[in-house]
Amino acid sequence: MLDLTFETPKPKTIAGAKHDWELVIGMEVHAQVASQAKLFSGASTAFGAEPNSNVSFVDAAMPGMLPVINEFCVEQAVRTGLGLKAEINLKSAFDRKNYFYPDLPQGYQISQLYHPIVGEGEVLVEMGDGTARRVRIERIHMEQDAGKSIHDMDPNMSFVDLNRTGVCLMEIVSRPDIRGPEEAAAYIAKLRQILRYLGTCDGNMQNGNLRADVNVSICRPGAYEKYQETQDFSHLGTRCEIKNMNSMRFIQAAIEYEARRQIAIVEAGGEVDQETRLYDPDKNETRSMRSKEEAHDYRYFPDPDLLPLEIEQAWVDDIAASLPELPDDKKARFIKEFGLTDYDASVLTAEVESARYFEEVAQGRNGKLAANWVINELFGRLKKEDHDITDSPVSPSQLGGIIDLIASDAISGKIAKDLFEIVYTEGGDPAEIVEARGMKQVTDTGAIEAALDEIIAANPAQVEKAKVNPKLAGWFVGQVMKATGGKANPGVVNQMVSKKLNG
């Protein structure tokens, strides 16, 4: 387990015209369950299909069609709860959330207001400066996604695509424990990382598979601590909800703007209205969408078409036993097993595919050397070309082969970089490339000494300078490397130069 010896970060303070203010943030994250079928129908969840091609009679709310729950979606919700160290409710139930919208054919959304499948959990959010925020999870419930209204295809008509209707969402609701824009983005990043490790959501924010509703309020310094002591929300300011955020950068910008908007209102003697707002990234501002609804506005009641959902503890235990190693545990193991720094371990475990790649490369090799090549050479090149690790043209075995050649002194570090470039662009077995192209390191001391003697004889003035200033010995090392095409063993060259100049 990760050693949780972190200090709690200080809350972000914003200076108003009259007072200092602090932020209080809670998040409702909608994560699309990674499942091939929808929550209550067998229709496909494939992204990018032709409009209205993945719609069953249940999704379209045809008369007489009844929902049948998808067991795999339930399993994914339980798996997520376990990954967030949350309580699993063996009995949960579905409710109807009633509202009218063109992309909601039923006229209601099936959700879990009163009895969610997952109870309280937590997420530890590291901030990269030795501090970490423990964000409590209040609940996770399953619900149907709505369809999509399209308003920009025709000036006189709007269109509806029901492909997304009925897709299973997990709504992950946090407590108001987040205290700044950077923490909010870090929380989303950590949550997405855990979901990807679990395989319960792909976390693709561009496709809308992970969206956040951000609740923002302000309070004076000290008020939040009173709330923590009493759990009395009256110590906090009126919150506004910013809907459907699908970018960590926009989440930070929206929170910054909304906090300053609320501060300006309060300091001018006004009151913040509890409302739902939208963020406009082009204008970098939030604007009012509607007054904030409460539960009674939706006339929730138990869904009469669905029995309460009861699951067995033994089934939950089986799911728990199948959980993968999660990010914090993997990071701790990488630090201990491979001797990595905290930073390198964080980079390598950021994505499950990156961690898997590194572990294959490092198996049976020097972990620090493997980490250096994966992070600096491979990741650097992939980032430059806007690729991720799944697109890497260099396989773990190929990169491992390059590292083996370095470790055996068959090639120098400089030649290794040239070899990496060849493997990256052309492919091939590293050892065979080195042999075929004559890239092996020169370790023959006789050949190296002959090259050095020639350079010394041709540069007597430089020799005298180097004897006075030992730092100039590097010039001779560079000349020998140049004379041998970079193939001379640098360690041997350094020793020989030192011996010749000081002998």
Swiss-Prot record:
SUPFAM superfamilies: GatB/YqeY motif (SSF89095), Glutamine synthetase/guanido kinase (SSF55931). Keywords: ATP-binding, Ligase, Nucleotide-binding, Protein biosynthesis. Transmembrane segments: none annotated. Its EC number is 6.3.5.-. GO terms for biological process: glutaminyl-tRNAGln biosynthesis via transamidation; translation. It catalyses: L-glutamyl-tRNA(Gln) + L-glutamine + ATP + H2O = L-glutaminyl-tRNA(Gln) + L-glutamate + ADP + phosphate + H(+); L-aspartyl-tRNA(Asn) + L-glutamine + ATP + H2O = L-asparaginyl-tRNA(Asn) + L-glutamate + ADP + phosphate + 2 H(+). Disulfide bonds: none annotated. InterPro entries: Asn/Gln-tRNA_amidoTrfase_suB/E, Asn/Gln-tRNA_Trfase_suB/E_cat, Asn/Gln_amidotransferase, Asn/Gln_tRNA_amidoTrase-B-like, GatB, GatB_C_1, GatB_Yqey_C_2, Gln_synth/guanido_kin_cat_dom. SMART domains: GatB_Yqey. The keyword Protein biosynthesis applies. GO terms for molecular function: asparaginyl-tRNA synthase (glutamine-hydrolyzing) activity; ATP binding; glutaminyl-tRNA synthase (glutamine-hydrolyzing) activity. Belongs to the GatB/GatE family. GatB subfamily. Allows the formation of correctly charged Asn-tRNA(Asn) or Gln-tRNA(Gln) through the transamidation of misacylated Asp-tRNA(Asn) or Glu-tRNA(Gln) in organisms which lack either or both of asparaginyl-tRNA or glutaminyl-tRNA synthetases. The reaction takes place in the presence of glutamine and ATP through an activated phospho-Asp-tRNA(Asn) or phospho-Glu-tRNA(Gln). Heterotrimer of A, B and C subunits. This is Aspartyl/glutamyl-tRNA(Asn/Gln) amidotransferase subunit B. The gene is gatB.
